[in-house]
Amino acid sequence: MIDVRAPHLRPRVYRRPDDERPYQQRGGPRNNPYSRDRREMPQRGFQKKSNFFKPEIKITNDMQVTDGKHKGVLLRSTESPKVRPTARRIRETLFKVLNRRVKFARFLDLCAGCGAVGVEAISRGALLSTFVERSAKMCNFIKQNLDACEICPTGHGEIVQLECLPFIRRMKQRKRCWDIIFFDPPYDANYDEVIELISRGACIKAQGGILVVEHPAEMFFPQTIGFLTRRKVVKEGDTALTFYECWK
């Protein structure tokens, strides 16, 4: 029997090269083993479970400015597991300890990430926040967060795309210093080199400058490092803040 229907109306036929049976006996896509294998093969291009279209921007209440003139502004961060923004409770604890020393201070945020800590410092009255971050993508998030708070990047906010060590060495040569330095590197990073440079007087105010290090709670830092003296250690869950003061 000859099928006289137009080609586009005929049933789709899946045929092995050595199969000479009429198409009525070969079976359709559902019972054809070759069509089944074809559906199970990895497909090219975008996959159904791909995260390509998943938004990489994270905006939650945890990323909210907690106090000051920009209180309540939602900050942006990335969904990447490699980035660990400073939690809201840690920021609240940090500025509770610093208290009035933030006002009119020059604040340096090393390994700034999305810039939440530096933005919070400006909100609480800091004269200047300098954000040091090696990732161009995260520097863009910092700029967006400054724009959200209507902070001019050439005024109260300064963004530097650079690694921490080269930045500190460069600023040491220029004899530039800050009143408060906040250092929050990835937890698997080497803290020693950066702290050692700062302890020799690099980037920190000679009389009364403060260095705050965020680190895992099980990590311990000595009482004295160079010109730095440990004043306080505050633990919040599995995270701790160590406060050093510089007397040069």
For each feature predicted by the language model, list its residue ranges:
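Class I S-adenosyl-L-methionine-dependent methyltransferase catalytic core
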Residues: 2-248
